[in-house]
Amino acid sequence: MEYILHIIIMLSIYVILVLSANLPVGMANMLTMCQAAFYGIGAYIGTFFLMQFNLPFIVLALIVMVATGLFSLLVSFASVKLKDDYFILATLGFQMIVYTILYNWTDVTRGPYGIPGIPSIKLFGVLSLSGVWGYAVLAVVLAVVVGLLFYAIKKSPYGRVLRAMRRDEQAVKALGRNTTLFKMETFFLSAAFSGLAGVIYASYVSYIDPTSFTLDESIFIISALFIGGIGNIKGPVLGALFVVLLPELLRFVGLPDAIAANMRQIIYGLALVIIMFVRPQGLLGEKA
């Protein structure tokens, strides 16, 4: 039973991550390659406040989301006016910078040795989450809340502006909308919720190190989004299912761990290529 609950927790975390990526990528046409950087920033900031102050979860989540969102402004100030490949390169550079800092700033992050013994999250400052049941409930509730929030954004006038920007940004500018501000706000929200996923992950596994927040992780998140489908809520959920369940299915094939890890990357790549040729909008496109 604990194994199933573990899968549910990781699935919920990835649902939040892929939904967060869907906001800039699927709605505002901003292909970002730094979701894992924000995921990691949230994990490390959350770890610091958990270990130093043991804050209640609501306070901790707000601090982490605001702090991670502010970090996103560092890259959005410099990159939101860039187009296509140049924007991708800017976010890729930010991803590499964050990973390098996490790996080499050993006085703070302990580098490749990681940070062990991260405390459990406390709800309302009293009830400490212990065991997988508590984390499973929290993770599922947060994934549902984030999904409903992003659905509300999609259906709101704000979401309609974002989708219009994806189709014709110049037309939106001609109507007097500040598209740069919309992009920065979208980037802020995406980073904030990625950071939220990070603090849940850090507290749940009680150990973090930079290898959990590499460029590969960003690629997995974006791959899950494109496989599932961009521009809606169902697509990211399906993509998260694919990313989380595939490694678990490979366990039952009986392959050695080293081969299974390589097979996972090969299958991800093949699935993404096939989807791009057969169904470019993803398995569940925007109208799904």
Can you annotate each of these PLM segments?
Residues 1-288:
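Transmembrane alpha-helices and adjacent helix-loop boundaries
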